[in-house]
């Protein structure tokens, strides 16, 4: 029987809760599989709504600053998204009789460099980690990357989901024939175009906290569109929201991945970067996602996504045809599900299988 491992997972909450969302899902999946996780956070406030029932058995949430006083380091140490580990903790890593697996978990991207960079090592020749080697783990969409987070039973849960019952329990009452759309967004000038985009059919827009709820009250709504504010949702309930809706507007990384597992049409708002690197990242994903799509669907999707992300003017933008978009979402999910999930690959990466 293989020994239970101890995992140290470090995350700095930069903004918008995307980093902590990814790390919390990983911590939960590790704990559910019997591993011990110490999650080191510089700001755990978001867990009050992301995980309202508290940390499950196997997860210990600790303040970042306390890592400098930790007595020992775990078997696996993950620094998420390039956060720099405290030097005293790195020294604890170097002091272990058996060096820990030191992993830099990178941001998700479909760009070509990901396949080239996945698995590369960075030997430490100086400093407190001298003698250790850090390795880079890149999530991605191909077999030559680290894959996507997908917990066991996720697709089965989505397939057996009772949307009407869940919506009723949340106080959401769509009218007969009304489309359900969810909205999770960063500040976005294109948001003012959304009511007109949705106006071609009756729509109930479910707005997540933050930018959507600040901006929507100031927008004129067509007679066919109404909106409802949502409270902060736990990760599990956010998944259910995506499953229940016909169309999902998502942002960043965590909700972007979950929208793909929902198997529903979605529109992605990528995290904007000052050097416009996000434009290349967006196009790289669309190139892969739409490679086998119907040409008409591909054209409409590219135009909408680029306009939604402020990369092209909002001129004659329409939603892709719903049936074609749904078929594309299902086909893409099936393709992704044929690849090993991220945790399976991460375990193989550090020399543990199963």
Region spans (language model):
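A donor-sugar binding/catalytic signature common to diverse glycosyltransferases
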Residues: 24-27, 233-281
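A short helix->loop->beta-strand "cap" motif at the edges of active sites that frequently abuts
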Residues: 97-101, 203, 264
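Active-site and donor-binding regions of nucleotide-sugar-utilizing enzymes
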Residues: 9-128, 210
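Nucleotide-sugar donor-binding patch of glycosyltransferase catalytic domains
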Residues: 265-311
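A conserved mid-protein helix/loop that constitutes part of the nucleotide-sugar donor-binding site
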Residues: 21, 188-196
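Catalytic donor nucleotide-activated moiety binding site of glycosyltransferases and closely related
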Residues: 200-231
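A nucleotide-sugar donor-handling region in carbohydrate enzymes
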Residues: 107-191
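C-terminal amphipathic helix plus adjacent low-complexity
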Residues: 151, 291-354
């Amino acid at each position: 029987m293989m020994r239970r491992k101890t995992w140290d997972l470090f995350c700095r909450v930069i903004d918008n809760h995307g980093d902590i969302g990814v790390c919390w899902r990983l911590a939960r999946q590790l704990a559910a599989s019997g591993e011990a996780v110490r999650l080191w956070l510089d700001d755990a406030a978001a867990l009050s709504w992301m995980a309202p029932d508290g940390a499950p058995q196997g997860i210990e949430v600790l303040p970042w600053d306390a890592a400098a006083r930790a007595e020992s380091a775990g078997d696996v140490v993950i620094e998420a998204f390039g956060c720099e580990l405290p030097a005293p903790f790195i020294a604890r890593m170097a002091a272990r009789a058996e060096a820990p697996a030191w992993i830099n978990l990178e941001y998700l991207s479909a760009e070509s460099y990901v396949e080239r960079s996945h698995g590369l090592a960075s030997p430490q020749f100086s400093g407190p980690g001298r003698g250790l080697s850090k390795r880079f783990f890149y999530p991605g969409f191909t077999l030559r990357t680290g894959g996507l987070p997908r917990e066991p039973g996720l697709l089965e849960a989505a397939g057996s989901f009772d949307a009407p019952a869940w919506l009723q329990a949340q106080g959401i009452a769509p009218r007969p024939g009304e489309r359900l759309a969810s909205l999770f967004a960063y500040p976005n000038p294109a948001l003012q175009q959304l009511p007109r985009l949705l106006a071609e059919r009756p729509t109930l827009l479910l707005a997540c906290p933050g930018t959507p709820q600040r901006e929507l009250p100031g927008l004129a709504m067509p007679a066919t569109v109404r909106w409802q504010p949502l409270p902060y949702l736990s990760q599990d309930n956010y998944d259910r929201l995506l499953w229940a809706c016909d169309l999902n507007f998502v942002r960043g990384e965590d909700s972007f991945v979950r929208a793909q597992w929902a198997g529903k049409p979605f529109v992605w708002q990528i995290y904007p970067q000052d050097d416009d690197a996000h434009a290349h990242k967006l196009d790289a994903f669309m190139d892969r996602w739409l490679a086998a799509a119907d040409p008409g669907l591909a054209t409409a999707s590219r135009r909408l996504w680029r306009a939604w992300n402020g990369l092209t003017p909002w001129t004659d933008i329409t939603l892709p045809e719903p049936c074609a978009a749904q078929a594309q979402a299902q086909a893409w999910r099936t393709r992704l599900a044929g690849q090993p999930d991220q945790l399976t690959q991460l375990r193989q990466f550090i020399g543990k299988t199963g």
